[in-house]
Amino acid sequence: MASWTLTSHLLTLHRDQFARATQSRFLAHAASGKLSKPLISHWLANDRLYMQGYIRLTGSLLRTLQLPAKPTPSKAAGGIEVRLLDWLVDALVNIRREERFFMDVAERYGLDVDLTGEDGVSVRPERKIAGLRRFEELFGGLTTGRQGSSLLPWLEGAVLFWATEKVYFEAWSWAKGQAEGAAGKACEEDEDGGAMRREFIPNWTNGEFIRFVETLEGILNEGVQEVVGRDERLKKEVEDRAAAVWRDLLGAEEAFWPEV
């Protein structure tokens, strides 16, 4: 029997909602080139605003880390919180690269990803899709500076990062599988000119992305196991805290896909 891990436990919860969050009609339409440029533009613009919350959560999580006073050897991976620090630094680099990629594709395919009003600064609430508003609430609940648990103070933030990256990868991997069925259709014939099938889907399903997700998964599971051990009370506490984040995250992810 496989040993217990936190992430494998979370994946047994809310399976129907996980399926809805990773197999939406929006994804199916993206895979077959049936999304219009205005719809993709609005969704991408919201996804870009999601990135800003992601960046703020990274900063908040960095503040929870208790880094060791003792130096870490140059060729050593370091303890859990040092490894989490390294992952968060990589996450910041990746999210900035992703935003530049968004802008490059948008410019080449004629997609408008600017949601700001006449002032060029603010975004009216009605311009935000339901999923973005839910993510902003979720990120905000973890970045308000409130005192967290003394047991694994980084837990909720790490679970949220793993969960959002895991669901995103699984969603676009499912879309990639659907796209393979439309392989005979030229991307230039797609309603978006090929932006999804040629640019975005390959970018969101590559090997580097899944390795990035799996790295955090390993850090999260090992960090929890180090603290929990065989203590069933601590295990239950960690499961409950993580499950609450997982539930809210799935709701936000499901709501992030527009109706088509």
Explain the meaning of each model-derived region.
Residues 25-38, 55-86, 150:
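Helix-loop segments that flank and shape redox-cofactor active sites
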Residues 15-20, 35-65, 94, 159-170:
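Alpha-helical bundle segments that constitute or directly flank the non-heme di-iron/ferroxidase center
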Residues 74-212:
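Active-site-proximal alpha-helical scaffolds that flank and shape metal-associated catalytic sites
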Residues 8-10, 36, 171, 244:
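Long, non-globular segments of proteins
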Residues 22, 50-57, 98-101, 131-135, ...:
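Amphipathic, well-ordered alpha-helical segments in soluble domains
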Residues 224-227, 231-234, 240-260:
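A cross-kingdom marker for long, charged
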